[in-house]
A protein has these predicted regions:
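Charged, flexible boundary elements
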Residues: 1-13
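Short, glycine/acidic-enriched loop or turn micro-motifs at the edges of active sites
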Residues: 27, 85, 108
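Short, basic/hydrophobic alpha-helical segments
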Residues: 53-78
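Long, charge-rich intrinsically disordered scaffolds of nucleic-acid metabolism proteins
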Residues: 88, 102-164
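Conserved helicase motor "Helicase C" RecA-like lobe of SF1/SF2 P-loop NTPases
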Residues: 96-97
Length: 164
């Protein structure tokens, strides 16, 4: 017999100890999906002009200020983006700015196999963010993070791809 009878299923709460963001990069815009402490489990979406690193860092600073106003605490920024044609330059810049940046192999993210799924940047951003949260919780086989090559190695790879 239970000491405290349950009225139903309990919600699973996740303690958010950082500002998490996924980056969907395109030629014209970067879509940022974020989850911040003190907002419950509501994800926010923001757009930054492609290549505008200063605008991206301003967005992260704004998210940090808002989270601090809600909770009274400062939080690190943790991001995820898919490995792709853009290379690893943004990953390196984010790390230099003090952001914990992760690059994921897009083929490694678990997806439902039986059903067809809509493909939109909004859904991709949410999927990436959920994968990052699961990865940071230590869940096994969630996704495979890519080790960023050195700039020199990346240049060598690019030359080989352009010749091929």
């Amino acid at each position: 017999m239970l000491d405290h009878p349950s009225d139903g299923l309990a919600a699973i709460r996740t303690h958010i100890s950082a500002i998490f963001g996924s980056l969907e990069l395109s030629r014209s815009a970067w879509l940022v999906t974020s989850l911040s402490p003190g907002k419950g489990e509501k994800m926010s979406r923001h757009s930054v002009t492609a290549g505008d690193v200063a605008g991206l860092m301003k967005l992260f600073a704004d998210l940090g200020r808002k989270a601090k106003a809600r909770t009274g605490e400062s939080y690190p920024i943790i991001t995820i983006q898919e490995a792709g044609l853009d290379g690893f330059w943004l990953h390196r810049v984010l790390q230099q700015e003090g952001v914990e940046s992760h690059v994921v192999d897009p083929a490694s993210i678990a997806m439902p196999r039986r059903s067809r799924r809509a493909k939109t940047d909004r859904l991709d951003g949410e999927t990436l963010l959920r994968a990052l949260l699961a990865y940071k919780r230590g869940e096994p086989r969630v996704c495979a993070m890519v080790v960023a090559p050195s700039p020199e190695e990346e240049d060598r790879r690019r030359i080989c791809r352009e010749r091929g």
